[in-house]
């Protein structure tokens, strides 16, 4: 560990395997001082795609994992930490994608970028967010959707709580959540809090067992946006394609960011329920259609992003998305 600290402090980059080994040390035997020193040195130098991938692999190595007999598995977990307090997009989108027929292994946590994260909203809605791995695996197999709370599946992360809190700044761990799905998701829509991270995270994903993914940043949002353009890196096997996406490309209208503002966990849960029942329409529904459509697209259930939006609309209007929400609550 000391060797890694000295090298990174000196400006050297770690390989994927070295970063993976450093992560192992962080979770197993490094002191808090060593952990803090390494994280600070990486931040000062700037984490490379290989280092992020290596840390993600090391975090997966230490995780409790599941292997649902369903596939391809899709996740909509993003980094959080964006500039806006919106409705909870990733969770609602995941339920809509599940309603469209995707097998969803939703990875999430409590709030980072909004008043309520995935776990906050689902907990208020009556979902057992702290379900053990075997229960989540069965839920995905039986219902086509399950929620994996990060602290339950990544107990080794306790080792970095103290150092991260004392450092008081973003570290490599701020981007690892979406890269460490405990079910080994095959397809992802992965929102990031900074546009500069889009190509970096896309390259990091190339080291992970993901077949299809969209890494997105929507003009300040870690989601596909309606208020402005979205920067996208699309991963399809070994190929990465970068482009810009507008609401018009999806057949949707632009809307100001204020139109999709979030609130308390209860208010966000009410919006989630309302979108799924059809009682909430307009920009909030459209924002979910955009992001659920992307998940449907990477799951292979639509030939285009705009086609994914149409499938998402049908999943809501038919009641299928609401049925998935009910099944998750009853599991």
UniProtKB/Swiss-Prot annotation:
Catalytic activity: N-(5-phospho-beta-D-ribosyl)anthranilate + diphosphate = 5-phospho-alpha-D-ribose 1-diphosphate + anthranilate
Positions with a binding annotation for anthranilate 1: 78, 109
Cofactor field: Mg(2+)
Protein residues bound to Mg(2+) 2: 222-223
EC assignment: 2.4.2.18
Enzyme kind, highest EC tier: transferase
Cofactor binding notes: Binds 2 magnesium ions per monomer.
Record-level Gene Ontology MF annotations: anthranilate phosphoribosyltransferase activity; magnesium ion binding
Pfam families tied to this protein: Glycos_trans_3N, Glycos_transf_3
Domain of life: Archaea
Gene Ontology terms describing biological process: L-tryptophan biosynthetic process
Complex and partners: Homodimer.
Family from the record: Belongs to the anthranilate phosphoribosyltransferase family.
The protein's role, per its UniProt record: Catalyzes the transfer of the phosphoribosyl group of 5-phosphorylribose-1-pyrophosphate (PRPP) to anthranilate to yield N-(5'-phosphoribosyl)-anthranilate (PRA).
Protein name: Anthranilate phosphoribosyltransferase
Species this chain originates from: Haloferax volcanii (strain ATCC 29605 / DSM 3757 / JCM 8879 / NBRC 14742 / NCIMB 2012 / VKM B-1768 / DS2)
Gene label: trpD
């Amino acid at each position: 560990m000391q060797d890694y600290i000295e090298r990174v402090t000196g400006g050297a980059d770690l390989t994927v395997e070295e970063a993976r080994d450093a992560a192992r040390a962080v979770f197993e035997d490094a002191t808090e001082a060593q952990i803090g020193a390494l994280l600070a040195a990486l931040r000062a130098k700037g984490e490379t795609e290989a280092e992020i991938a290596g840390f993600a692999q090391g975090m997966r190595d230490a995780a409790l994992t599941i292997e649902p007999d369903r596939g391809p598995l899709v996740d909509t977990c993003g980094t959080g930490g964006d500039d806006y307090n919106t409705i909870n997009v990733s969770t609602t989108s995941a339920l809509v994608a599940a309603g469209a027929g995707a097998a969803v292994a939703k990875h999430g946590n409590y709030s980072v970028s909004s008043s309520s994260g995935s776990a906050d909203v689902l907990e208020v809605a009556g979902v057992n967010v702290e379900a053990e791995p075997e229960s989540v695996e069965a839920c995905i197999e039986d219902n086509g959707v399950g929620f994996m709370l990060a602290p339950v599946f990544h107990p080794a992360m306790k080792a970095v709580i103290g150092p991260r809190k004392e450092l008081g700044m973003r570290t490599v761990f701020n981007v690892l959540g979406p890269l460490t799905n405990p079910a080994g998701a095959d397809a992802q829509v992965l929102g990031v809090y900074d546009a500069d991270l889009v190509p970096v995270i896309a390259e990091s994903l190339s080291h992970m067992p993901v077949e299809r993914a969209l890494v997105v940043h929507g003009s300040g949002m870690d989601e596909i946006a309606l208020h402005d353009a979205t920067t996208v890196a699309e991963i399809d096997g070994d190929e990465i394609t970068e482009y810009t996406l507008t609401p018009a490309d999806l057949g949707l209208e632009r809307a100001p960011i204020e139109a999709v503002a979030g609130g308390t966990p209860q208010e966000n849960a009410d919006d989630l329920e309302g979108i799924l029942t059809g009682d909430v329409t307009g920009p909030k529904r459209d924002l979910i259609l955009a992001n659920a459509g992307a998940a449907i697209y990477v799951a292979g259930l639509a030939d285009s992003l705009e086609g994914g939006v149409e499938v998402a609309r049908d999943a809501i209007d038919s009641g299928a998305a609401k049925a998935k929400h009910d099944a998750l609550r009853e599991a």
